[in-house]
Design a protein with these regions (language model features):
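S-adenosyl-L-methionine-dependent methyltransferase catalytic module, highlighting the catalytic core
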Residues: 160-168, 178-291
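Conserved N-terminal segment of class I S-adenosyl-L-methionine
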Residues: 1-145, 149-153, 163-166, 240-241, ...
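A short His-aromatic
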Residues: 154-158
Length: 292
């Protein structure tokens, strides 16, 4: 790493404090802008190993298509109705095995992908026949102003340099282009983690694993907005993400109970969102859309 001491990717401050009770997760928070992140950040090959493990163990790629199908279609419908022109060029960053690209293509988009996994890239090229770049967005050599929409769905939190990633996305978007981001909501994950931490004996008795998820970066609505503004974006809309189905992490053994838990969580947080006029956003994941 370039620095042995933690520093903030968003504002550059080194006024960083480790969070409790998150010592095991190595979570730190910037005291200036409140961005939360792990430190030290892992090397790139370790990140690749984590991504490959995710697609083979935690969330096998065969299950992704069905689990996120409804979410993908709702997002595409929203983009088509609100933002995208008739000629639609999409770049899906962290495209995995190309399921979002495939759905977009079926709806008339010209889909391109970026993926760090060799297996994912080969699958997309050989099975789906879409153009895909192996690597990360920062080093990709696309021409500026090439795309109408760039999607980073559950991806930005795993980027070692999310600010530079967003700045590169800004350059690659056409005028009035759109970036669509889905990521875990730090506020929700923190609440769940604290409940599990202080009631751990009870969850251990029921053999329920800790459901909270913290990646390299953990964004709240305010910190993702600050980062998008710093990258040059405007007209930033943040809301609770649409639901995905299933329980890929195996937290709830009953699929019916998993579905009920998700639905109740989603609609209770939606009520908070609407009754607060969009000021309280506590869903498990955020959907963020911003314009160039």
């Amino acid at each position: 790493m370039e620095s042995k001491n933690p520093y903030c990717n968003l504002c550059g401050s080194n006024n960083i404090k480790q969070l409790t009770p998150f010592q095991k997760e190595r979570l730190y928070r910037c005291q200036k802008c409140h961005l939360v992140f792990r430190w030290p950040l892992p090397e790139n090959d370790m990140i690749l190993n984590q991504v490959e493990k995710h697609y083979t163990e935690a969330d096998p790629h065969q299950s992704v298509a069905s689990a996120k199908n409804k979410f993908f279609n709702k997002l595409l419908e929203h983009l088509e109705n609100k933002y995208a022109p008739q000629e639609r060029e999409l770049l899906d960053v962290g495209c995995g095995y190309g399921y979002f690209m495939q759905l977009a293509s079926e709806r008339g988009w010209r889909a391109h992908g970026i993926e760090i996994m060799e297996k994912g890239c080969l699958y997309i090229k050989e099975k789906l026949n879409f153009p895909v770049y192996k690597g990360d967005l920062i080093e990709a050599d696309y021409a500026q102003q090439s795309f109408d929409v760039i999607s980073l769905l559950d991806v930005l939190v795993m980027c070692p340099d999310p600010l530079l990633t967003l700045k590169k996305a800004y350059l690659l978007l056409k005028k009035k282009g759109v970036v669509a981001i889905r990521l875990r909501n730090y506020y929700f994950q923190r609440i769940i983690h604290q409940v599990y931490h202080y009631g751990g004996w009870l969850f251990s008795k029921w053999k329920i694993p800790n459901p909270s998820v913290f990646h390299l970066y953990s964004f709240s609505p305010s910190t993702i907005k600050k980062m998008l503004l710093k990258a040059g974006f405007n007209n930033i809309k943040i809301k609770n993400s649409y639901l995905t189905t299933g329980d890929p992490y195996g937290i709830v053994k009953s699929s019916f109970l998993a579905k009920i838990t998700k639905v109740l969580t989603y609609y209770s947080t939606q009520l908070l969102y609407y009754f607060s006029f969009g000021k309280i956003i506590l869903g498990p994941s955020l959907l963020v859309i911003a314009n160039k």
